[in-house]
Design a protein with these regions (language model features):
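Acidic, contiguous N-terminal accessory segments
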Residues: 22-120, 124-149, 331-336, 346, ...
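Catalytic-core regions of glycoside hydrolase
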Residues: 286, 296-387
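Short acidic, S/G/P-rich loop/turn micro-motifs used as interaction or catalytic elements
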Residues: 62-66, 167, 386-387
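Feature activates predominantly on carbohydrate-active enzymes
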Residues: 97-323, 330
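Bacterial Sec-dependent N-terminal signal peptides
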Residues: 1-31
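Detector for intrinsically disordered, low-structure N-terminal pre-sequences
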Residues: 9-12, 76, 291
């Protein structure tokens, strides 16, 4: 009886040690492989892929899909017709759990399997495989047995690039797109200003501006890597790049300042729409047209209208134009809030809740008086450099 009891104790302790060993091994593996951005689900298994990383050379698709653009250690992978000779099997096979850009990646002892909902998901599946291969190679490890399911938590994942102050060589932007693609960024808002050779308004372009065709090629390159570039052309304010030119001075809100357009001058819109059309030609694959609109207050050359009224006149005209071009307009929303005396609480994190509430109680009617005039087809975006 005593011997049986001792055996049971040893068996229990042995099972506990084995379980802890498995947990420690999984934790160690997770520390060894850093996926950026992190994936939704990952499950490390016991064991490793049995072949050397350098021998991962061939891929087979039972659905006859093409390989996506490849990076790093996956660049040399070729597609073949014989599944027995392929280390990777991949397919675009929509499944119930898949959404746009989602994929699954499974590394077994003798096969790597990637499935996706669409070409973007396939692209991201191979990017994740490359990260695992590079981490393993850099640490002289074998590829882990692992099962990954990944989908985006945020559908549109853009960054903003501002080229108005300085334009790099074209090669820089191609290289940057490659870097962003590997981080699964899928959008760029490009603040272009005078760095585009406008055909309709050539005086606006700077001497180092790129032609529409050159930006279009960059946009095409980005799209092939699942990145859509949308232009940002400053509208009501930040307009010095347009209004500094002699022929455009009559469009100034203040004749002595090149900062802002007069929103009551019809020719303001003729010029702005020309700039938008050229920008859309240069970036034909984007869904959006960012029209700017921040940090500006106008008088309409002493019209008697309030700055908020004038802002809304301009905003409605340009958002309507953007929609007619099948673009979703994006607008910086700081000025309507500022003009309604509601901007302060947004950037002052030292205010108490009661202070914020009191400001909104007092000033919300300033905004509500015009609320029906705000366009409904517009993305209202807020910049914040104080976070």
């Amino acid at each position: 009886m005593l011997l049986q009891f001792r055996f049971s104790i040893v068996l229990i302790i042995g099972c506990q040690l084995f379980f802890l060993s498995c947990l420690n091994n999984q934790s160690k593996q997770e520390d060894q492989y850093i996926l950026i951005p992190s994936v939704l689900e990952k499950d490390f298994k016991e064991g490793h892929y049995k072949k050397e990383i350098k021998k991962i050379k061939y891929a087979y698709s039972p659905t006859n899909d093409s390989l996506p653009i490849l990076y790093g250690l996956t660049q040399h992978i070729e597609i073949i017709d014989n599944p027995k000779d392929a280390q990777i099997e991949f397919a675009i096979e929509p499944e119930e759990k898949f959404i746009e850009e989602s994929y699954s990646l499974q590394i077994n002892e003798d096969k790597i399997i990637i499935k996706s909902n669409d070409s973007a998901g396939l692209f991201y599946g191979f990017l994740t495989l490359n990260q695992l291969m590079e981490d393993a190679s850099n640490q002289n490890l074998q590829l882990p047995k692992i099962k990954i399911y990944d989908k985006p938590k945020i559908a549109f994942r853009p960054i903003q690039i501002d080229v108005k102050h300085h334009l790099e060589k074209k090669s820089y932007y191609y290289n940057l797109i490659d870097e962003l693609a590997q981080l699964k960024i899928n959008g760029i808002i490009l603040e272009i200003e005078d760095k585009l050779k406008y055909k309709r308004r050539p005086e606006v372009a700077s001497s180092d501006a790129l032609a529409i065709e050159e930006w279009r090629e960059i946009s095409k390159y980005a799209l092939a890597r699942n990145i859509e570039i949308s232009p940002l052309v400053q509208g009501l304010g930040h307009a010095s790049f347009v209004l500094k030119h002699k022929k455009n001075k009559p469009l100034r809100d203040d004749p002595n300042s090149d900062w802002a357009f007069n929103p009551l001058n019809p020719k303001t819109y003729e010029l702005q729409f020309d700039l938008y059309l050229d920008a859309i030609e240069a970036f034909p694959h984007g869904k959006y047209l960012h029209i700017g609109g921040d940090e500006v207050q106008t008088s309409g050359r002493g019209s008697g209208k309030s700055p908020l009224e004038l802002n809304l006149i301009w905003l409605n005209k340009v958002t309507s134009f953007a929609s007619k071009q099948n673009r979703i307009p994006i607008f910086w929303d700081d000025m309507p809030l500022k003009q309604a005396n509601l901007m302060g609480p947004i950037y002052n994190n030292k205010m108490s809740k009661s202070e914020v509430d009191s400001i909104w109680m007092a000033n919300e009617p300033n905004l509500n008086r015009f609320i029906e005039q705000f366009p409904k087809n517009c993305v209202y975006m807020r910049w914040n450099y104080h976070m």
